[in-house]
Amino acid sequence: MKRILLLIALAVSLCHVALAQETSSPDNFPPDDTSVVLDSTNLPIVWIDVDGKTIDRYERISARMKIIHNGKGKINYGDTVAHPGQHIDYEGYIALRYRGNTSFNLSDKKPYSFRTLERPLEQGEKKKKVSILGMGKDNNWALLAPYSDRSMIRDLLAFEFARPWMEYTPQGKLCELFLDGTYYGVFILTELVTQGTHRLDLPDPGEEGDELTGGYILEVGDNDNDTTHFVSKYHPVSGDGFVTYSDCSIFFIAKFPDSEDVTDEQHQYIQSAIDRMEDVFASKNYTNPDTGYCKYIDVQSFMDYQLVNELGHNVDAYRLGAKLYKRRNSEDQRFKMAVWDMNLAFGNCKHNQGSSTSGWVSRYNSMLYSNGDPHMVPFWWYKLISDNNYVRKRFARWAEWRNSNLREARWKATVDSLANEVTCCGAEARNSQAWPRWGIKVWPNVYISTSYADEISYLKRWITNRITWLDGILQYTPPAPTLVGDVNNDGEVNIADVTDLIDILLRGEADEETMQRADVDNDKEVSISDVTALIDIILRGNT
């Protein structure tokens, strides 16, 4: 088996090299239809001007960027001459390149990385921190290119599911992109999981003492010789823990400080910190509440990372792009996690059972090994889910998620809201004109949707079925349904509810759950018609 794995790994490596050779295109990978016209849109409009230069995957080039955004709910116009005075959200120099691995190699529509600059690269790189589309000031950004994700919202959906629970989750904004005057489609302008005042607020690590202990950002993933990495002392194990795959390794890649800036002392320290954490997980007493793994990881952070990735059944979770970060010991010596890259989640991947609505991704090492996939889940995830205390806490945490932003009405409203952004002013239609792919197989889709509405329906069905499976495994019991008209939630419908409803109307505000109960006629707004409906319910005794 080891020989087979090595041969497969070699073949994958050669394939990767062959793909990676096409790091650029003289025409910058244009869409199928380059004649798309944008008159007006609800989404921000991003113009990038490279003046005919070739964009590369690894080397950045100078470019100019301009973003028109007149504000949420307002229309942005593509013709700035006919519509002068529009709000320019950002205008300036950027350092631009392509980004991504499979999202670059296996997608016709390419994603970008850019840094905002004081001046063009030719005059000496000087980064400039700016706020873009309401996101906090920074100089490091990405333009994700939804392609295999036909909904174009899976990454944003995962971010919204995780945001109330995790210390940091990237913000992202849907937009429409022009490159040298050609329409390129719908993109997501997003923050990255990087160090920064408005992102992961980590200090620069020093060379000794407490300053050496933080901050750091690591990624579990590919061994890339162009980056600073180290290998785990411990090999991955099977989903039941009985088999150790000694011919497979787990790699940690330094993301902050990056390979150009990290010193030998810092590299040695963060490797030793990972070693200490893993040594504890490998010990017999790893569940000890005082000396065990709780001392080295923020359990709730790891749990929330697990819940959002398992909710999406993300085939890349834990093993490809998993982000860990650490502050200085004087502040918090524990590792925490952040969410990133879920465009293949939520039923959007055919391989590794990615479309299944059952099963734990954290237990997939046996399948990965059988498939010859060398990228495996670190052993400490098996150890975590083998701890009864962790499992009990996960039951409770899932219930918190389900009673909050994962209530059926709320998560469906989140999907609808994001989908509406894409469709309400024609952005999806323009994107489909530029990249006509409906009814055509795109890697690695399992469901070949024929329209945007079809894709969103599939997405909702898939999430519904996945939540049903997780509810059963995580022993979640939904609360009893609220009586229609029970505005004050006391278990009865009577004149007191009318009084409370009128009070809500007069004040014009209440918490979200109360507003939902106050929407008696279920028309998505609270108005005098709800008072009429409530009185009718009381008079008829129909609750």
Where are these regions (language model features)?
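Short, well-structured beta-strand/strand-turn elements
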Residues: 164-178, 314
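Calcium-binding motifs, dominated by EF-hand helix-loop-helix domains
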Residues: 311, 483-487, 516-520
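Conserved NTP-binding catalytic cores of kinases and kinase-like/nucleotidyltransferase enzymes
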Residues: 21-152
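Sec-dependent N-terminal signal peptides
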Residues: 4-14
